[in-house]
Amino acid sequence: RQPGSTFKIIACYAPALDAGGKTLASVQDDAPFTVGNKTYNNYSHTFGGFTSIRKAITKSINIVTVKTLQDIGVDLGYEYAENFGFSTLTDTDRNLGISLGGLTQGVTNLELTAAYATIANQGEYNEPNFYTQVLDHDGNVLLDKTQIKEQRQVIKEDTAWLLTDAMKDVMTSGTGMRAYFGTGMAQAGKSGTTTLNRDALFAGFTPYYTCVVWGGYDDNSIQSATGYPKNLWKAVMKRIHADLKAKDFEKPSGITQAVVCAKSGLLPETDVCDKDPRGTQSYTEYFAEGTVPTENCDHHISLQICEASGKVAGEYCPADQVVTKTYIVGAEKGSADYQYCATEKFLNGTCNIHDAETQDEEKPEEEPADPPDDAKPEETHEPEQIPEKNEE
């Protein structure tokens, strides 16, 4: 069956982080997007603007996923999906739709579970088995599958941990909150649905177990609800972890941290990225060693704005009417960032209220200078007083 958004991790984000030069901080512009005759949409039918891969995983944002695969190349995504153990892929799946789980023949739940178990197993694939041994009543081994036939490293250990950390956010603040069973046990997962809710899935794991739940009809009928796979995942996983010690996923030594701007994935500009009108965009992200960005944010800009005109201040704008503001640059129309964007037209225009004439008009009249202290006062002469005649 179709794996829906659970395949975003497999065919897009795993190769993007492992070999595509991307990090969890890398951004794409979540805005209206069309390739050829195909227009892509998000489940929410909203567009968030510049969005990081971490957030795109957490909130299951389609457009960021498709643009990321477009960047790294469809062939790379297909190659990684094959290496994760999917045997049903065909050449017709070599298109951007693979990033959203749009596959010609779909996948089996067993192979999807094995792929997610690969991430949980620090990137190492183990061929799945339904049993390890079958014994007779005397304890003699009748069937033995303790030896794994196929074992290979699909993604780097660091990549597996980074994907896991992002999928932990899915459980606590994203599309998988309904599946989260608490108890202090670390949990990572990814939800998935297909067109008209014909398929509903939840794939996730803990430091102990991996579980994938698919729900749908044999005849591919439309479903009215898609949350029940999460409920089932939660019920099963909570029960089998009841007596297990709570623990987190072990972080590899090759993981480091750095402060970046959420709108560019690059190093924040001092007094710029933290002055975004929506609040500071600086946050701390995890990186594999050697992938921390070295360039500064290129999606924020600081401008001097004249309050009287609301435009870029010119040379004649009074200082007491000029303020510094932070804007987004490069945002596409239709996205949440666009209302905060300094467009090319805005950048090329300046204040049309203040000019040389208004500057002269606003100059106060000069007061006469006070005389110096040693200046002698000018002599004054009173007019002669002529005695009045006494008229009788």
Summary of predicted features, one role per range:
Residues 2-28, 56, 115-119, 163, ...:
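Active-site SXXK
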Residues 106-299:
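A penicillin-recognizing enzyme superfamily signal
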Residues 39-41, 73-114:
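Mid-domain, small-residue-enriched loop/turn segments at the edges of structured enzyme/sensor domains
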Residues 145-147, 258-261, 271-273, 278-285, ...:
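Intrinsically disordered, low-complexity repeat and linker tracts
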